[in-house]
């Protein structure tokens, strides 16, 4: 069964009430568009306005309960999505703590990587110097032995001077070839080492730049 309510007269009588509710609603909006303060529904005034409009008490109370329930449900749903200033501050503080922790971890990782890189580079240079010293000693020993043998052969076999001289030249050529190969390998090794170091430094710089952009 539907209620027959004179729409025009009720609207003009309810207009101050609805206008007051609208003002309260606008004033109570927060930063996120939710109510900061709940203004209760004026049920007594609503019933009186209905009665003045010619509606009996039972129908007035029924309409009052329906509108009050709708108003309360709407306020509860809006309140569920509201966020307080304290919650926003807590989230912002937690984000700052997380960023500080992340920055500390990145700095610690960077320091560890730099220390490890420095240690590896020093170890590589130490290995290269040790190889150079060992090869130089072996080369000197080989050259000394070869020259000693050549001198003995020259004393014992003066007629084989030309042959021994040829052997000496061949040995010198082999030594030069080995030295040239060693220099080539050493240059290649240095180039690879510098490329590896540059790649690590570039990667660390890119990681640090990404972190700075994330912080900013």
Swiss-Prot record:
TM spans, by residue?
193-215
Q: What UniProt keywords apply to this chain's record, in alphabetical order? A: Coiled coil, Membrane, Mitochondrion, Transit peptide, Transmembrane, Transmembrane helix
Report the main location listed first in the record: mitochondrion
Membrane topology according to the record: Single-pass membrane protein
Q: Where in the cell is it found?
A: Mitochondrion; Membrane
Query: Biological process (GO) annotations?
Result: calcium import into the mitochondrion; mitochondrial cytochrome c oxidase assembly
Instruction: List each coiled-coil range.
Output: 111-133
What cellular-component terms does GO give this entry?
mitochondrial inner membrane; mitochondrion
- Keyword Kinase recorded: no
Domain of life per record: Eukaryota
Looking up InterPro entries in the UniProt record yields: CCDC90-like
What family does this belong to? Belongs to the CCDC90 family.
Q: Which PANTHER family match?
A: PROTEIN FMP32, MITOCHONDRIAL (PTHR14360:SF1)
Q: What is this protein called?
A: Protein fmp32, mitochondrial
Which organism does this record belong to? Schizosaccharomyces pombe (strain 972 / ATCC 24843) (Fission yeast)
Upper classification of the source organism reads: Eukaryota, Fungi, Dikarya, Ascomycota, Taphrinomycotina
């Amino acid at each position: 069964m539907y209620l027959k309510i004179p729409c025009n007269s009720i609207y003009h009588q309810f207009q101050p009430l609805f206008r007051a509710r609208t003002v309260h609603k606008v004033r109570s909006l927060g930063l996120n568009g939710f109510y900061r303060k709940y203004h209760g529904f004026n049920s007594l005034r609503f019933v009186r306005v209905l009665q003045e409009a010619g509606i009996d008490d039972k129908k007035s109370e029924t309409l009052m309960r329906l509108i009050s329930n709708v108003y309360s449900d709407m306020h509860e749903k809006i309140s569920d999505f509201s966020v307080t200033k304290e919650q926003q501050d807590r989230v912002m503080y937690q984000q700052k703590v997380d960023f500080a922790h992340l920055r500390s971890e990145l700095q610690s990782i960077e320091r560890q990587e730099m220390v490890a890189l420095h240690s590896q580079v020093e170890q590589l240079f130490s290995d290269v110097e040790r190889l150079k010293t060992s090869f130089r000693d072996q080369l000197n020993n080989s050259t000394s032995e070869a020259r000693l043998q050549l001198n003995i052969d020259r004393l014992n076999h003066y007629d084989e001077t030309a042959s021994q001289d040829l052997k000496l030249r061949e040995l010198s050529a082999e030594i030069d070839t080995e030295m040239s190969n060693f220099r080539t390998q050493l240059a290649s090794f240095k180039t690879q080492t510098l490329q590896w170091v540059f790649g690590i430094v570039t990667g660390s710089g890119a990681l640090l730049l990404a972190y700075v952009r994330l912080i900013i």
